[in-house]
Amino acid sequence: MLRRKVSTLLMTALITTSFLNSKPVYANPVTKSKDNNLKEVQQVTSKSNKNKNQKVTIMYYCDADNNLEGSLLNDIEEMKTGYKDSPNLNLIALVDRSPRYSSDEKVLGEDFSDTRLYKIEHNKANRLDGKNEFPEISTTSKYEANMGDPEVLKKFIDYCKSNYEADKYVLIMANHGGGAREKSNPRLNRAICWDDSNLDKNGEADCLYMGEISDHLTEKQSVDLLAFDACLMGTAEVAYQYRPGNGGFSADTLVASSPVVWGPGFKYDKIFDRIKAGGGTNNEDDLTLGGKEQNFDPATITNEQLGALFVEEQRDSTHANGRYDQHLSFYDLKKAESVKRAIDNLAVNLSNENKKSEIEKLRGSGIHTDLMHYFDEYSEGEWVEYPYFDVYDLCEKINKSENFSSKTKDLASNAMNKLNEMIVYSFGDPSNNFKEGKNGLSIFLPNGDKKYSTYYTSTKIPHWTMQSWYNSIDTVKYGLNPYGKLSWCKDGQDPEINKVGNWFELLDSWFDKTNDVTGGVNHYQW
């Protein structure tokens, strides 16, 4: 399917001559060394003592209107099993089902193909009325919501905040995000939540783009923890988009995976089983925090403890099934701005010292790369759609190379330090020398000059021409595929023409051969 989709892109590019269609990308994952994790335990314990009776509302945005319906219903069943009834913890789910993939009647009491609200409790799910915030939904309605519409997400958050007021809000978004759950869709890494029952103007399942969420949600919908139960969302671009203080929707912390996520997703029964009144411990070793695994009281649980829960239980679950290729990271998004500043400073210096060829040697091309990466290096389609590389590994290899100046190495070292601060916990593939708490966040680094072609046409088109979604502008306005408007690409741009100010401008200066007033292939004049 990926090959067919990319071929369609190529054909559209030919029809529109100098302009082209393409698709966006995103990323996420990381963990600390044992010493750092133990220090974190002390920090989060002291934090939790400040509020001994907090309320926590967890919002589960469940887009099951696609071929993940069976898997997502299983996730809800896991939640019902693991959830411990508590006046301090509410678990609210917006569930959109499909008429095509599952006829299950047990998980939610009946089979349906519309959109419903539920309060998840121990071994049961109670259907809810949407009230003023979501009047289309009642306990008897047949309303079909478009989960790819940001206004639906906005309504859901507003409903939860109005009717289940809390001191801490967690938003879990579950569906396709790029990879494992349907690796063949080239849009998966730039967006999330595909709704098969609601098509966009191109006749494809509608979805939520990163920039689109920022355009529609506001600071009012912000959350304490944002978790993507989806693939390829652990990127620097995604993390920066939703950093606190951006003036709109944000999250203080983030749970996400840089590579693809296996089909079962998060292990919700184990996660919720460890959120219980009174806390305590079990007899399992905790490789994330050290010692034995702790249970956390919802009345005092912190963002860091929640993040550690997701990371540790995903590690346990995937490793128990022999899947050592899986990753998950927990990020402190308050540190995302300093990471971006460090990467942008490095980008400016790479431009000033004309180090394109040296970076390309590190990155590699075709079927070989020595950099830690989160895509299939043997697939040219994936080189086009999501060439995501581990940021820390890139900076570390720059720092160790003899082909860069001492200034460049110092800037790379500074970026490594900032990444270490942002990546609180992470785990990854030990065979790739994954460093917990350092590796696990990706960045877009394409082979922009390479030309792509298929048996559909002999015309060869540079990868960068097909990657115009990676942009600061409104790409739809210029006839390109959605969505652009990435804060990572916009912030830090140098106002002077032909002068690099950030990572995006560095890539555009390397790969866009036409930088006149038209902005070249992606309509952006760096």
UniProtKB/Swiss-Prot annotation:
GO terms for biological process: proteolysis. It comes from the Bacteria. Coiled coil: none annotated. One of its GO terms (molecular function) is cysteine-type endopeptidase activity. Residues 1-27 form the signal peptide. Residues 28-50, 182-190 form a propeptide. Disulfide bonds: none annotated. The keyword Transcription regulation does not apply. InterPro entries: Pept_C11_CLOspp (IPR014173), Peptidase_C11 (IPR005077). Its EC number is 3.4.22.8. The active site is at residue 231. The keyword Lipid metabolism does not apply. It holds the Pfam family Peptidase_C11. Belongs to the peptidase C11 family. Heterodimer of a light chain and a heavy chain held together by strong non-covalent forces rather than by intramolecular disulfide bridges. NCBIfam families: clostrip. PANTHER family: ALPHA-CLOSTRIPAIN (PTHR37835:SF1). This is Clostripain. It comes from Hathewaya histolytica (Clostridium histolyticum). The gene is cloSI.
